[in-house]
Structure formats: structure tokens, C-alpha cells
Design a protein with these regions (language model features):
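Flexible, P/S/T/G-rich "lid" or insertion loops adjacent to the active sites of thioester-utilizing
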Residues: 178-236
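Cytochrome P450 heme-thiolate monooxygenase catalytic domain
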Residues: 95-99, 149-155, 314
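Acyl-CoA-dependent O-acyltransferases
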Residues: 1-68, 211-418
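Short amphipathic alpha-helical face segments that pack within enzyme cores
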Residues: 147-155, 243-248
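Acyl-thioester-dependent condensation/acyltransferase catalytic cores
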Residues: 48-142, 146, 161
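Long, hydrophobic, well-ordered secondary-structure blocks that form the structural core
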Residues: 145, 152-163, 173-175
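Small-residue-rich loop/turn and linker elements
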Residues: 57-101, 165-194, 259-290
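Short, charged low-complexity linker/loop segments at the C-terminal edge of domains
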Residues: 161-166, 398-399
Length: 418
């Protein structure tokens, strides 16, 4: 059954913001949260309150000649509640679920760029046999990135618990770059745009990669990550996160050089620039506030510390290199490790709910905190500093060699990693 929820206090006042061309590239951020209990009436009230301080989500897209705008029009958002008596319980799944047929029935997906489409859709499915509640959220990427999404969901979680949101409040106005902002000294950095393909070609390549690669979800406990970090000479210069990415690249390179005489030479890194460029993206800014940077060539593509330092240097430099696709000798790092979804959106059920998202890509590392699990006594426990890395890898020998190396490293406590 679908109903509609309006802001408890209309605050949009017809305000409009203009979207950047890069905002139109993306579709929606679709997530699933599985809880042992949800009060549906209280959830609806929390959504209504949240919409009042997030009027952009109660808005609609307008097109004015060549401009795309969002008008804060205080429109209702759809809320769907259904009951499922077929599924015995929510299965034990990795954070990133590659099989869309599992997750799609539990998400009411925001449609891409139609004129009268809600920018947020929420669906709750109660599993009658286990009494679990599956909350599916679809958040238009026109609104913002993962940081924007988690900001809204954290506000929603706190309203549900009867708490006030944590400051700062969301900031919606945007600064759009113009021709007058152009810096010709950056033109040499725009070479990656030459590799950009049309949407149809990218979709075709995506389908091809889905058939020639398999998804891997690799988990690391907090103890294992600490051990990896300790192996990096000069570890004070790099973070645990840098070393984790370096380990993934080193492992792939050592196997790839044996199989195909190729290896990854660089990495693209998605970096959130909120509060780095405070004048255009302060803390709390709601937008797609990230840049995609490329590292320099790895001085030693088979060295843990060499790659980790190269990654850290690129992040620290944080210069503009916006791209659309990457080459065969490059990987992409898109990490959510900064955001612990299962702590930010717990609705008061600390370490008792699981978070899932969909889609993995070839040579594209998506990094998340581990979900809580149940111990032998059926109690929920969580390794708060553990990580899951999801990516797609070539089927056959490449995948098998990677898994073999990873499993040996885990069993030997990374004794062969250097």
C-alpha cells in the first residue's frame, strides 16, 4: 500500500537551485536497511519532520530552456508499506549485493529525470515469518552524493528516536562554475575527458563486464587491518585505509603480471571536498561535492608502502581531475569507509541492523564498514573498524589466483606481504 507524506511544516517557499551538468550524470542512490523492529507510524512522523528541514527532497525538477532546476515546492513523497510471508528471514548477505533481483523488490526506485517525479522514495517491507523490517530508500543523485544521503538518513534516524539532528543543518545553495572561473593552467589535466564515452556505450561496456567478470566481497577484521598497517614502513605517513587499498592493488598486480604481463599503474580516487573548499562546500553542504583525482604512476607497483604513499600524496594534493571512465591499467577507489552506515542510521537499534547497497564494477573498489553479525549465542556483535571491499574481477584464473593469495595472506597473518 502506497501513501504520501508531506513536510510537517512547509519550508520550501518556492526556492530554486540550478543543477550542474555533472549532477545529471547520476541516477539514484539505492540502499536497504534491515531492522529487528520498526514502528511504522513513528517512522512516518519522522519522515514528515525530516522533510521540513530537507525541503529539497520535497521538491521537483524543472527544465527552463537549457537549465535544470530543483524547485522546493513542498510536494509529498511516496511511502510504501507491504508485508511479505514468503521469505523466511533476511539472508546473510555482503554489504554490496550484486544480484539486483534480491534487492530490487524491496526498493521503490526514483526514476531518472522525469518532470513530476519525487526525489525521494521510501518502502518498508515487513517479513512476517521473521518479524524483520526491510527499509528501502531511493535518493535522487540530483540532490547529492553519499555524504548528503547519509546526512539526511541520520537526521531521520534521530527524529525517529525523538532526538534533534546533529549540527550543522543541511545547506542547499550551490556555487556553479562559470567560464570566468576557468583556469587555463588546468587544461593539461583534462586529457581524461578524451576517453569519455556516450551513455549508451558505457551501458554496453557495463553489460559486457558483467558477463566476463565476477563480484568479489573481501572482508578484513580490524585486527587484520592493524596488522597490514604495521607492515608499511613509514606507516605514520599513511592511513589504514591507504594501506588497505595498496594491499588490494599489490595483490592484483602480482597475479596479473604472471597471467597477462599487465598490471595497474595508477588509481583514480573519489575525494569528498566538503570543508576543504569551505567557500563553495562547507560542512553540511548538500550536493555532489566530490572530485575524482588520479594518482601519479606507482613508483613500485608491487610494493605495499610505495602504493600507499602514492595514494596519500594524491589525496593530500586534492587537485581537480574530473573523469568519466578509466583505462585498463587503472583502478578506481570509491570508499564509504569514512561513513559507518550501520551506526549513522540505526534508529536506536545499535549494532542490530544491516546495511546493503547494490552494483559493483570491474576494477572499481567500493569500501564499507562490516555489518553486524550474530554470535553463537544469537547476540548481535560488530567489528567497528573492520572493512569489506567489493569489486569485479576477470573470471577464471585471475579471480582464482586473487582468492588463493588473499586466503593465504589471511591464514599466514600477511607474512608474505611487503
Amino acid at each position: 500500500m502506497t501513501s504520501h507524506i508531506i513536510p510537517c511544516s512547509p519550508t520550501g517557499n518556492g526556492h530554486r537551485i540550478e543543477l550542474a551538468g555533472t549532477d545529471l550524470i547520476f541516477e539514484s542512490i539505492d540502499n536497504i536497511f534491515v531492522y529487528p523492529l520498526l514502528d511504522i507510524d513513528r517512522l512516518k512522523q519522522a519522515i514528515s519532520r525530516a522533510l521540513s528541514i530537507w525541503p529539497i527532497l520535497a521538491g521537483r525538477v524543472l527544465i527552463n530552456e537549457d537549465q535544470y532546476l530543483i524547485e522546493f515546492s513542498d510536494q509529498p513523497i511516496p511511502f510504501t508499506y507491504i508485508e511479505n510471508d514468503q521469505l523466511e528471514y533476511w539472508p546473510n548477505l555482503p554489504v554490496v549485493v550484486d544480484d539486483m533481483t534480491i534487492c530490487k523488490p524491496f526498493i521503490d526506485v526514483v526514476q531518472y529525470k522525469p518532470m513530476d517525479e519525487s526525489l525521494l522514495r521510501i518502502k518498508v517491507t515487513r517479513l512476517l515469518r521473521s518479524n524483520e523490517y526491510v527499509l528501502g530508500t531511493s535518493f535522487s543523485h540530483l540532490i547529492g552524493d553519499a555524504a548528503s544521503n547519509i546526512h539526511f538518513l541520520n537526521d531521520l534516524s534521530r527524529f525517529y528516536q525523538g532526538l534533534e539532528p546533529i549540527l550543522p543543518r543541511p545547506i542547499f545553495d550551490r556555487y556553479l562554475w562559470t567560464k570566468d572561473d576557468a583556469d587555463v593552467s588546468l587544461l593539461s589535466n583534462l586529457k581524461p575527458y578524451q576517453n569519455a564515452d556516450k551513455r549508451e556505450i558505457i551501458a554496453t561496456n557495463f553489460v559486457r563486464d558483467q558477463t566476463t567478470t565476477d563480484q568479489l566481497n573481501i572482508s578484513f577484521s580490524s585486527i587484520q587491518l592493524e596488522k597490514l598497517h604495521s607492515l608499511a614502513d613509514g606507516k605514520d605517513e599513511v592511513t589504514v585505509h591507504d594501506v588497505l587499498n595498496a594491499y588490494m592493488i599489490v595483490t592484483m598486480n602480482k597475479n596479473s603480471i604472471e597471467i597477462s604481463n599487465e598490471y595497474f599503474q595508477r588509481a583514480y580516487i573519489l575525494v569528498n571536498y566538503r570543508n576543504l573548499l569551505h567557500s563553495i562546500a562547507p560542512t553540511g553542504h548538500v550536493a555532489n561535492s566530490f572530485v575524482i583525482m588520479i594518482t601519479s604512476d606507482f613508483p613500485n607497483p608491487f610494493s605495499l608502502i610505495s602504493i600507499a604513499k602514492t595514494i596519500r600524496q594524491a589525496i593530500n594534493k586534492c587537485h581537480d581531475k574530473l573523469i568519466c571512465v578509466w583505462d585498463t591499467n587503472e583502478v578506481v577507489i570509491n570508499s564509504n569507509f569514512k561513513y559507518d552506515w550501520s551506526n549513522q542510521v540505526d534508529f536506536g537499534m545499535i549494532n542490530q541492523f544491516r546495511f546493503h547497497t547494490i552494483t559493483s564494477l570491474k576494477s572499481y573498489f567500493r569500501i564499507f564498514h562490516l555489518n553486524p553479525i550474530k554470535d553463537q549465542e544469537d547476540h548481535w556483535i560488530k567489528d567497528n573498524n573492520g572493512a569489506e571491499v567489493s569489486f569485479r574481477i576477470q573470471k577464471g584464473e585471475m579471480k582464482n589466483k586473487f582468492l588463493e593469495t588473499y586466503q593465504q595472506d589471511i591464514e599466514t597473518n600477511f607474512i608474505n606481504v611487503e
